[in-house]
Amino acid sequence: MNTINIAKNDFSDIELAAIPFNTLADHYGERLAREQLALEHESYEMGEARFRKMFERQLKAGEVADNAAAKPLITTLLPKMIARINDWFEEVKAKRGKRPTAFQFLQEIKPEAVAYITIKTTLACLTSADNTTVQAVASAIGRAIEDEARFGRIRDLEAKHFKKNVEEQLNKRVGHVYKKAFMQVVEADMLSKGLLGGEAWSSWHKEDSIHVGVRCIEMLIESTGMVSLHRQNAGVVGQDSETIELAPEYAEAIATRAGALAGISPMFQPCVVPPKPWTGITGGGYWANGRRPLALVRTHSKKALMRYEDVYMPEVYKAINIAQNTAWKINKKVLAVANVITKWKHCPVEDIPAIEREELPMKPEDIDMNPEALTAWKRAAAAVYRKDKARKSRRISLEFMLEQANKFANHKAIWFPYNMDWRGRVYAVSMFNPQGNDMTKGLLTLAKGKPIGKEGYYWLKIHGANCAGVDKVPFPERIKFIEENHENIMACAKSPLENTWWAEQDSPFCFLAFCFEYAGVQHHGLSYNCSLPLAFDGSCSGIQHFSAMLRDEVGGRAVNLLPSETVQDIYGIVAKKVNEILQADAINGTDNEVVTVTDENTGEISEKVKLGTKALAGQWLAYGVTRSVTKRSVMTLAYGSKEFGFRQQVLEDTIQPAIDSGKGLMFTQPNQAAGYMAKLIWESVSVTVVAAVEAMNWLKSAAKLLAAEVKDKKTGEILRKRCAVHWVTPDGFPVWQEYKKPIQTRLNLMFLGQFRLQPTINTNKDSEIDAHKQESGIAPNFVHSQDGSHLRKTVVWAHEKYGIESFALIHDSFGTIPADAANLFKAVRETMVDTYESCDVLADFYDQFADQLHESQLDKMPALPAKGNLNLRDILESDFAFA
């Protein structure tokens, strides 16, 4: 076994950086200066340890080829080996006589697949196994190539069936053994139906498999020198063998790159001093530059980042600096509770991942004799394993968040650096941050409080009701909920481990934090200094922005832009319309029918039951369609989702969890049920927010025209190349949407994953614009850029007009301390109105791209969507627009 040793990085330059230390010491004292730089140093060490752990795990599992450290090596070697395989094929064909055994098996397989399997399998054997004899490695290569040939024919010969029925399920299996076992079952089923030409696979003989592997190793050596052969115990009976080793220069190349990657993979942490202000496109947030200085904008390349270097956007810089200057601290009371209950076997908070795996279902006594019982047990066990995989990942994340909270628990204040994605959405940089899940948000509170006062106490109670899920009713009813549950709240604050009513609420940890503050007001009165962040959340933010920019009164009313005595719940509105259709279909819908299906390849005719809308409606009525069924689909409409996307969401969010929990037994045909519901949601939401759908279609038309290549019809001369889409947000942030087709070609293997092959000839051309992605991405990216601009404008407005210093920000959620909540409530609305009164963002977008169109395209561009009669000033009077 080859050992790949990664040299440890020396990050001492971070902790010992003199310039940031002196700056920090002058402002915050030497102790905090040392601690801050030590934390930044530690972040790099933590990141390195995480990378090394992953690398070592991949080494042991034989998956080192999947690590980024090995991929450049493989990318370099692949073309060389592919060329050698092609040459060998030609050499063999040119010769007379009997052809080599290996050729007979390899000639029907793509050289790219043979080369990749050889390199990946060889690396796996040499870095994970002790038995690295030529025979052992050759046998492994031969078996892997046979598996690709055998099961790859399902993908290639029955592409439609594979894509529709097999691929997704195959990808859910983890590990070669389980993937192969699954494909064997699929193969048997397909053969029984006359697919694959009705021919069963004739397994390769062991000697033939080794012949194939040996020839592949020979070609690997001939073309790349990646490995070398060594004779062991020559002449010793029973011990004479030939081993294979990774060439030292290649082992060193992997180790060197792994070390470099480990050095630029920091696990960023909070700061114990205010973050470094942003003054340029790099170097803000953290005080020492480290190996990888933080970038203001998260882009896919340095070239993309450099576009922002000379952009004048003072309001953007100002907003990010105000946001990250917010002082936070750990909520010790919530932390004390979280430290205990997350270790309980039966945690009262439903969303907390358990410490131990759920027990497998009991095996039926007749499982060995009853195939149906075996199948049912396997299905139930598979659900447990699937849930456990997610549980492990979530548990690791939970324990890291708790570790971070405990680490910073005794600091009077901590801060979180912020930056943006390329659309301008604002993100906290560290892994532990205020934009996390309910527990993470509950563990944090703002560091600077003020006496709560009467108005602040009012908003505190509104916040408490929101955390309990009582947020779809008017404010008086929310207040009433809190007052009626006064005893419960006080009991939870006094003994949260004994009185766990708080754990039953919609956002349990945030509600627990509220309970403690509510009790504080009860004990100390309105002079109580409260620093709990109270959040005002948008009501389906994407549709709010589309409705505002188009003055759409119908859509605006559905998402609470207009004053109303009751809360408009667009998810509930759509669910109601869906239920009306379900009721009608249950009575007058279509009946089930038996449809005949003709196999395109074999001509075999089979029958299957297609559920009618009457049966499907009955299933959904039995399950119960509420806002939770429609929420994700409606929410993602403004971000580009359509009927097909809705189908997958319904399947993943509703049907599959219901089946796993035993509550979805009515869904006898999950895919049909999901498709039916997706269609109803699409129809219902399309008539609810007509203008938003129209705006999205208009944006797609614009992006499609820009991404089109214009040629002279007679000469074929290119008159205009494909263009990226560019626009500027109302606060001056430039957005470039530029999806490109990868220069590489993707190689898909059945069990060894995917790999992108570099072209063998470098054309020195930039890759082309991906027209499909440009079109499908424009609506979500455009509206995300608008809500990012609104957030930044709100931060600056609230800070400069109302003197607010503390902000809790999550895209369309705006929070601050109770004493300042009323002013932030106003600021969010004022900036929304100001933005769309002073900017016609769609007209501005048109102006920014129209000049790039060729004259022949101008008549293809549809007119700007018509505007409605929504009075933007009404937003100022709407209680529930952001509430």
Curated annotation (Swiss-Prot):
Annotated control of activity: Inhibited by the product of prokaryotic viperins (as well as the human ortholog RSAD2), which make various 3'-deoxy-3',4'-didehydro-NTPs, suggesting these modifed nucleotides act as specific chain terminators for this RNA polymerase.
Gene Ontology MF annotations: DNA binding; DNA-directed RNA polymerase activity
Reaction equation(s) it catalyzes: RNA(n) + a ribonucleoside 5'-triphosphate = RNA(n+1) + diphosphate
Swiss-Prot/TrEMBL keywords: DNA-directed RNA polymerase, Nucleotidyltransferase, Transcription, Transferase, Viral transcription
Gene3D superfamilies assigned to the protein according to its UniProt record, in alphabetical order: 1.10.287.260, 1.10.287.280, 5' to 3' exonuclease, C-terminal subdomain, DNA-directed RNA polymerase, N-terminal domain
A Pfam family assignment: RPOL_N
EC number: 2.7.7.6
GO annotation (BP), single: DNA-templated viral transcription
Consequence when changing K631G: Partially inactivated
Recorded consequence of changing K631R: Partially inactivated
Outcome of substituting K172 to L/G: No change in activity
Active-site residues per Swiss-Prot or TrEMBL entry: D537, K631, D812
Keyword Nucleotidyltransferase on entry: yes
GO cellular component: DNA-directed RNA polymerase complex
UniProt KW Transferase keyword: yes
Cited function: Highly processive DNA-dependent RNA polymerase that catalyzes the transcription of class II and class III viral genes. Recognizes a specific promoter sequence and enters first into an 'abortive phase' where very short transcripts are synthesized and released before proceeding to the processive transcription of long RNA chains. Unwinds the double-stranded DNA to expose the coding strand for templating. Participates in the initiation of viral DNA replication presumably by making primers accessible to the DNA polymerase, thus facilitating the DNA opening.
Subunit structure: Monomer. Interacts with T7 lysozyme; this interaction inhibits transcriptional function of T7 RNA polymerase.
Name of this protein: T7 RNA polymerase
Gene source species: Escherichia phage T7 (Bacteriophage T7)
